[in-house]
Regions:
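Short, small/polar-rich loop/turn modules that mediate ligand/substrate recognition or access, typified
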Residues: 258, 263, 320-322
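Substrate-binding pocket helix/loop in short-chain dehydrogenase/reductase
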Residues: 183-185, 189-194, 290
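Catalytic loop of short-chain dehydrogenase/reductase
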Residues: 177-179, 222-259, 271-272
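A glycine/serine/threonine-rich, flexible loop-to-helix segment
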Residues: 235-237, 259, 271-294, 304
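Short C-terminal tail/terminal secondary-structure segment
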Residues: 70, 78-79, 182, 309-310, ...
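Alpha-helical segment proximal to the catalytic Tyr-Lys
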Residues: 213-214, 255-256, 318
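N-terminal secretory signal peptides and thylakoid transit peptides that target proteins
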Residues: 2-20
Length: 334
């Protein structure tokens, strides 16, 4: 058997426990995020106090926002995630790979041995450069492909560019999304509604269609859904619709592509501390108390979802398809 497919009983049990219980091998102390210093702990930690809790300072950025300007800065696994070679030699394309869950997945994939191409909105270049440097620091190939996912021609070009630069594709993560809070449906213009739909629904449709020409048995497609698909809030009318649609395209496409040996799964985050929230995704009042409604009483950090994206792409998850994996601090479904 190939090395990447071989796993001992002990390492399998240990690995599964680690994947399901935590987002990284070495956790981060909560106060580290406020000081931008990272302290590693090898012991157990209370998940309720592991990361910053509300109230948060008032802050606002133009859409789509930058990780580097958030306070506290999110943990995307820059210093907390340690890989074990689970994705050695794999080739991944991640949309929205500059920040949030996409950034966490990109860092984790590189540290698990994968080459990674990331897409991002052109104004996010500052964050994207950091991710590219982190990928290269692991000795992996890093490809930056900025562009607007509302453009069908660009989405096809994105896939072609990534496949050419990486010499193939094994993992496709449709993660990029637009989220803007509106008190009423009357406040949403047709242009804004179209922007959300094009980014969150059309783009994955175009990207997956283009990617199928490169995908072989054993590859993985992963979509980022949301707790909003199951428990939508009144102020995210358009965004919540797209996440319900994401959940259903994952389940439908998984059945369609299973005979081809292609797995399709999703991740459904709850309230996660990302640039999406500070750039119009939440009202200032909700932002100050962000995550307080969860049983854990705090928002999640992108790094806490990184291992889920790794697990769904790994060979030892070969029987998992059409599944939605939640990470929401105890609220919502699944």
């Amino acid at each position: 058997m190939k090395t990447e497919n071989t796993i001992s009983r002990r390492s399998a049990l240990t690995g599964m426990g680690a994947v399901l219980a935590t987002a990284s091998i070495n956790p981060i102390m909560a106060n580290a995020l406020n000081s931008n210093e990272i302290y590693i702990s090898n012991g157990t930690e209370d998940p309720n106090t592991k990361y910053p809790r509300p109230p948060f300072k008032e802050q606002s950025q133009p859409w789509p926002g930058l990780v580097s300007k958030m306070n506290p800065r999110p943990d995307n696994g820059e210093k907390s995630y340690e890989g074990t070679g689970r994705l050695k030699g794999r080739k991944a394309l991640i949309t929205g790979g500059d920040s949030g869950m996409g950034r966490a997945a990109a860092i984790a994939y590189a540290r698990e041995g994968a080459d990674v191409a990331i897409n991002y909105y052109p104004t996010e270049e500052e964050d994207a450069r950091e991710v590219i440097q982190l990928i290269k620091a692991e000795g992996r190939k890093a490809v930056a492909i900025p562009g607007d996912l509302r453009d069908e021609a660009f989405c096809k070009s994105l896939v072609d560019q990534a496949a050419k630069a990486l010499d193939g594709l094994d993992i496709v993560v449709n993660n990029a999304a637009r989220q803007q809070t509106h008190a009423s449906i009357l406040d949403i213009t047709t242009e804004e509604f179209d922007w959300t739909m094009k980014t969150n629904i059309y783009a994955p449709f175009w990207i997956i269609k283009a990617a199928l020409a490169y995908l072989k048995p054993g590859v993985s497609i992963i979509g980022t859904s949301s707790v909003q698909a199951y428990a939508p809030t009144e102020d995210l009318y358009d965004y919540a619709q797209t996440k319900a649609a994401t959940t259903n395209y994952i389940k439908s496409l998984a059945k369609q592509l299973a005979p081809k040996g292609i797995r399709v799964n999703g991740v459904a985050p709850g309230p996660i501390w990302t640039a999406l929230q500070v750039s119009g995704g939440a009202t200032m009042e909700k932002l100050k108390e962000f995550g307080s409604q969860t049983p854990m009483g705090r928002p999640g950090q992108p790094a806490e979802l990184a291992s889920i994206y790794v697990q769904l792409a790994a060979n030892d998850a070969s029987y998992a398809t059409g599944q939605i994996y939640g990470s929401s601090g105890g609220e919502g479904n699944p």
